[in-house]
């Protein structure tokens, strides 16, 4: 009887140890964000910041390290080729606003990233690949010209005066000769603006880009 009790105790201890050691599949990384946004387009900072959360059923699980990889394509990231940044294994519990530290990022280009974490109960696998798009990084990259009335609305009106029309509808027809893989629109307006493509509105923004003192600063989306 004593031997049976000892054997049962050993079995229970082994089962308990198995339950306390999570596998890499049970440690998942979720809610990956760049500049606190999900797969954003139009990031205009040279060193974007990454954030993520750890999801696991195991109690008392805390992050002890992370590793981030960034590439110009999802394919390069999968095979770890032509990486623009590989942070290496960093011993840190930081999971918010980790700044990009790789090669210089180009304006108007898409990038792809992933992260895996190390915890006090083991390491996880690579997260799903996420993406973000860079915007215009300096004034020299803005090539567009203002469109609207060619002259002041009323004789003698000053530049900062009100215009005659409360709202304007401007149309620009164009054709593309090649298959479109990716297209990004940068739009700015003095006041609220909405954009439609082939009759369909392309965003749900309200009062975009945003109010400002137009004689000194104009935002864009």
Where are these regions (language model features)?
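Recognizes extended acidic, P/S/T-rich segments that occur
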Residues: 61-110, 120-126, 142-151
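Beta-strand-rich ligand-recognition modules
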Residues: 97-104, 197-221
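Short beta-strands within extracellular/lumenal beta-sheet-rich domains
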Residues: 164-176, 217-221
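Aromatic-lined ligand-binding clefts that engage carbohydrates, nucleic acids, or primary amines
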Residues: 174-177, 181-197
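C-terminal motif of bacterial Sec signal peptides marking the signal peptidase cleavage site
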Residues: 18-19
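Pro/Thr/Ser/Gly-rich low-complexity, intrinsically disordered linker/stalk tracts
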Residues: 23-59, 129-139
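Structural beta-strand segments of beta-rich domains
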Residues: 46-50, 170, 181-183
């Amino acid at each position: 009887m004593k031997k049976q009790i000892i054997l049962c105790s050993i079995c229970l201890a082994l089962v308990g140890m198995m339950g306390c050691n999570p596998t890499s599949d049970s440690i998942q990384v979720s809610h990956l964000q760049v500049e606190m946004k999900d797969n954003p387009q139009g990031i205009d900072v040279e060193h974007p910041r990454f954030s993520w959360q750890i999801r696991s059923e195991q109690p008392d699980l805390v992050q002890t390290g992370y590793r981030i990889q960034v590439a110009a394509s999802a394919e390069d990231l999968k095979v770890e080729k032509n990486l623009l940044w590989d942070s290496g294994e960093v011993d840190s519990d930081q999971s918010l606003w980790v700044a990009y530290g790789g090669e210089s990022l180009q304006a108007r280009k898409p990038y792809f990233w992933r992260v895996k974490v190390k915890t006090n109960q083991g390491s996880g696998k690579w997260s799903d690949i996420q993406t973000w798009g860079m915007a215009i990084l300096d004034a020299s990259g803005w090539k567009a010209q203002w469109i609207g009335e060619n002259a002041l609305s009323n004789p003698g009106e000053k530049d900062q005066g009100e215009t005659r029309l409360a709202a304007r509808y401007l149309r620009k027809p164009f054709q593309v000769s090649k298959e479109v893989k990716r297209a990004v629109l940068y739009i700015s307006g003095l006041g609220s603006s909405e954009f439609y493509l082939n009759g369909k509105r392309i965003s749900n923004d309200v009062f975009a880009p945003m109010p400002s003192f137009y004689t000194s600063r104009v935002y864009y989306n």
